[in-house]
Amino acid sequence: MRQESLVTKYDYDFENDSIFFYGSNKKYRSSIDLDGIILDIGEDDQIMAIEILDASNRFNLAKEDLRNIKYFEARIEVSEENIRLTMKMSVNKRNKLVDKGLDALGLNSINLPISTQGIELNC
C-alpha cells in the first residue's frame, strides 16, 4: 500500500542543528528513532512528521544552508522487520540549488503495518 503525504512546514533549529518537517493534522500516536532521525507516527500508522538531529553533519552542509531548503522528499518503506527511509533535499547555496540525500534503516520495533509512504515539501 502506498500513501502520499504533503508536509506544509519545516523548522530549522540553528542552535540544536535539527530540522523538523511537519504539517499534518493527524493525531500523534508514537515516535520511532532511526539513529537520530525521528519519525512521528499518527493514529492511522502513517508518518506525520520527521525530525533530523545533527542535520548539518548528516547532509554535509553548513548550518546556514539549512535555513534555505527549497525542496524535501522522503520515501518510507515499512516491512515486518525494518523501516527504511530515503530522503532527498535541495537547498539554495550561493544562488545555486544543491541536492543532498540521506538514508536510514532501523527496526520496526512498534510493529507498523507493511506499507510504502511518501512525504514531500516544496518551499
From Swiss-Prot:
Keywords: Purine salvage, Transferase. Its EC number is 2.-.-.-. This is Putative hypoxanthine phosphoribosyltransferase. It comes from the Archaea. It is an enzyme of class 2 (transferase). GO terms for molecular function: transferase activity. InterPro entries: DUF2283. May play a role in purine salvage. One of its GO terms (biological process) is purine ribonucleoside salvage. It holds the Pfam family DUF2283. Disruption phenotype: Cells have increased resistance to the purine analog 8-aza-2,6-diaminopurine (8-ADP).
